[in-house]
C-alpha cells in the first residue's frame, strides 16, 4: 500500500514541504531562525487570541482591562507576559534571520527576499499598534510621535495623519482601529509566510559555503526537524 502522505492531496503538500523536502546537507544553526519565527508567530497568535477575549478597545477602559487580565483572569499575567516577551523574541529571531540572509547572500532569491521585506514591515506595523493598545502614557506618546512622522509628507501629510487618527488627535477612534488592525495583521502575516515558503521551495535554500548544493541534498525529516526541535528547546 502506498504511503498516505505521498498520495493524499493535502498531505502531499505537507510531505513535499516538511518531510521529503531536499535540503542542503551543511546548513548551520543560522538556518534555525526561520522555524523559530514560525514558533514565535504561533505563540503570538494563540496568546493574542486569549488576550483579545478580555481586552476592551476603549480609551476609558483599555488600561483597566489590561489590569483585569493581569489580576483577575486565570494565568492572565502569564499570557500577557508571554505575548509581550514573545514579541521581543520575535524581533531577535527576525533580525538574526535577516542578518543571516544578508551575510550569506539570500537576497539573490528575489521573490523570497521581497516577500521577506514585506513580512518585516508587516511585523513592525503590528508590533507598533500592539504597543499602543494598553493606552498608558507611553502608548499615547508612541502613537502620537510615530504617526506624526507622516506629517512630513508634503501637501498631504497633515490630512493623512488626521485620516489615520480618525480625528484631530489620537483618541478613541485611533485605539479602536489600531486594535482591529493588530488583530487581523498576524493572520495576513501567516498567509505571507506561506507565500515566503512557497517561493523558497521553488529555488531551494542556500548554504554556508555559498556553492550549489544540488548534488548533495538530504531529506528535511528527520535531520532538520530534529535540528529545529532542538532550536525550540534551546
From Swiss-Prot:
The gene is MT-CYB. Heme 1 (or BL or b562) is low-potential and absorbs at about 562 nm, and heme 2 (or BH or b566) is high-potential and absorbs at about 566 nm. This is Cytochrome b. GO terms for molecular function: metal ion binding; ubiquinol-cytochrome-c reductase activity. Heme b b566 binds at residues 97, 196. It comes from the Eukaryota. One of its GO terms (biological process) is mitochondrial electron transport, ubiquinol to cytochrome c. The keyword Transmembrane helix applies. Keywords: Electron transport, Heme, Iron, Membrane, Metal-binding, Mitochondrion, Mitochondrion inner membrane, Respiratory chain, Transmembrane, Transmembrane helix, Transport, Ubiquinone. It is found in: Mitochondrion inner membrane. The chain crosses the membrane at residues 33-53, 77-98, 113-133, 178-198, 226-234. Heme b b562 binds at residues 83, 182. Component of the ubiquinol-cytochrome c reductase complex (complex III or cytochrome b-c1 complex) that is part of the mitochondrial respiratory chain. The b-c1 complex mediates electron transfer from ubiquinol to cytochrome c. Contributes to the generation of a proton gradient across the mitochondrial membrane that is then used for ATP synthesis. The keyword Nucleotidyltransferase does not apply. Belongs to the cytochrome b family. InterPro entries: Cyt_b/b6_C, Cyt_b/b6_N, Cytb/b6-like_sf, Cytochrome_b_N_euk/bac, Di-haem_cyt_TM. It is a multi-pass membrane protein. PANTHER family: CYTOCHROME B. Its main location: mitochondrion. SUPFAM superfamilies: Transmembrane di-heme cytochromes. Gene3D superfamilies: Cytochrome Bc1 Complex, Chain C. Binds 2 heme b groups non-covalently. A ubiquinone binds at residue 201. One of its GO terms (cellular component) is mitochondrial inner membrane. The cytochrome bc1 complex contains 11 subunits: 3 respiratory subunits (MT-CYB, CYC1 and UQCRFS1), 2 core proteins (UQCRC1 and UQCRC2) and 6 low-molecular weight proteins (UQCRH/QCR6, UQCRB/QCR7, UQCRQ/QCR8, UQCR10/QCR9, UQCR11/QCR10 and a cleavage product of UQCRFS1). This cytochrome bc1 complex then forms a dimer.
Amino acid at each position: 500500500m502506498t504511503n498516505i502522505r505521498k498520495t493524499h492531496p493535502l498531505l502531499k503538500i505537507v510531505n513535499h514541504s516538511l518531510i521529503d523536502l531536499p535540503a542542503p546537507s551543511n546548513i548551520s544553526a543560522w538556518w534555525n531562525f526561520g522555524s523559530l519565527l514560525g514558533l514565535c508567530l504561533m505563540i503570538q497568535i494563540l496568546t493574542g487570541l486569549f488576550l483579545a477575549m478580555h481586552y476592551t478597545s476603549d480609551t476609558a477602559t483599555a488600561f483597566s482591562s489590561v489590569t483585569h487580565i493581569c489580576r483577575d483572569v486565570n494565568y492572565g499575567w502569564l499570557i500577557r507576559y508571554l505575548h509581550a516577551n514573545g514579541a521581543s523574541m520575535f524581533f531577535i529571531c527576525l533580525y538574526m534571520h535577516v542578518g543571516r540572509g544578508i551575510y550569506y547572500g539570500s537576497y539573490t532569491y528575489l521573490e523570497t527576499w521581497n516577500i521577506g521585506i514585506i513580512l518585516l514591515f508587516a511585523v513592525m506595523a503590528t508590533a507598533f499598534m500592539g504597543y499602543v493598545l494598553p493606552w498608558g502614557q507611553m502608548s499615547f506618546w508612541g502613537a502620537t510621535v510615530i504617526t506624526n512622522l507622516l506629517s512630513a509628507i508634503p501637501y498631504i501629510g497633515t490630512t493623512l495623519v488626521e485620516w489615520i487618527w480618525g480625528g484631530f488627535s489620537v483618541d478613541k477612534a485611533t485605539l479602536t482601529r489600531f486594535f482591529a488592525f493588530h488583530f487581523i495583521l498576524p493572520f495576513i502575516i501567516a498567509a505571507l509566510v506561506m507565500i515566503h515558503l512557497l517561493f523558497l521551495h521553488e529555488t531551494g535554500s542556500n548554504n554556508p559555503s555559498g556553492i550549489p548544493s544540488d548534488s548533495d541534498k538530504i531529506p528535511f525529516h528527520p535531520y532538520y526537524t530534529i535540528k529545529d526541535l532542538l532550536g525550540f528547546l534551546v
